Amino acid sequence: MALPAGPAEAICALCQRAPREPVRADCGHRFCRACVVRFWAEEDGPFPCPECADDCWQRAVEPSRPPLSRRLLALEEAAAAPARDGPASEAALQLLCRADGDPLCSACRMAAGPEPPEWEPRWRKALRGKENKGSVEIMRKDLNDARDLHGQAESAAAVWKGHVMDRRKKALTDYKKLRAFFVEEEEHFLQEAEKDEGASDDDELADPADRFRSLLQAVSELEKKHRNLGLSMLLQ
């Protein structure tokens, strides 16, 4: 709720200025209403104290739940960075500048001008770093799985390539055999035709129709023989 600023508590814990529309957390820290709204803009709840990260509102709902500051202590230590100008108190380094990631002390906040700098609490940055680390691990696992699948695909492609080459060699061999057979049968047919032509010269009175029928029968037998041979080779 909005409270008037007293003389001893006239500084917002976030912007280090006199609070405008001051609000006070249950832990006793005072803030500007705009600073608190800005601090909690990315939060869905629970809403801890921006200064000490104490979840006093959450403890009222869940009494057995430990304070947020204790639950995130390890993450705060992992994300903490040294002060840029020397040692400073822990309370003065609760915020990190969004621009360069360095700790944001009270002096920097007071010298920032009319508009306060972009800041965020250290524990929130620690949580985000933990989430990013988990995402990196998932991406690394997906990459390893993709490499394994790629290796399996290459092995399968090599096996199928070997099968195709074997079938190609076999088909080429069968083609050469079939072509040699056709050449041999063609020579045999020409020899038979020459013999029939010589016999017809000796017998001038032979009927041309009979000669044509005999020649046609020889051609049919040759085609049948070729067809049977080709079919047998294809079925091997």
From Swiss-Prot:
Key word Zinc-finger present: yes
Q: Which reaction does it catalyse?
A: S-ubiquitinyl-[E2 ubiquitin-conjugating enzyme]-L-cysteine + [acceptor protein]-L-lysine = [E2 ubiquitin-conjugating enzyme]-L-cysteine + N(6)-ubiquitinyl-[acceptor protein]-L-lysine
Q: Show the GO cellular component annotation of the record.
A: cytoplasm; nucleus
Q: Where in the cell is it found?
A: Cytoplasm; Nucleus
Mark the RING-type zinc finger spans by residue number: 12-53
- Asked if the keyword Amino-acid biosynthesis belongs to this entry, the reply reads no
What CDD domains has UniProt attached to this entry?
Answer: RING-HC_TRIM39_C-IV
What are its E.C. numbers?
Answer: 2.3.2.27
User: Where does the record put the Glycyl lysine isopeptide (Lys-Gly) (interchain with G-Cter in ubiquitin) cross-link?
Assistant: 195, 224-225
How does the entry describe the domains?
The RING-CH-type zinc finger domain is required for E3 ligase activity.
Recorded protein name is E3 ubiquitin-protein ligase RNF187
**Source organism of the structure:** Rattus norvegicus
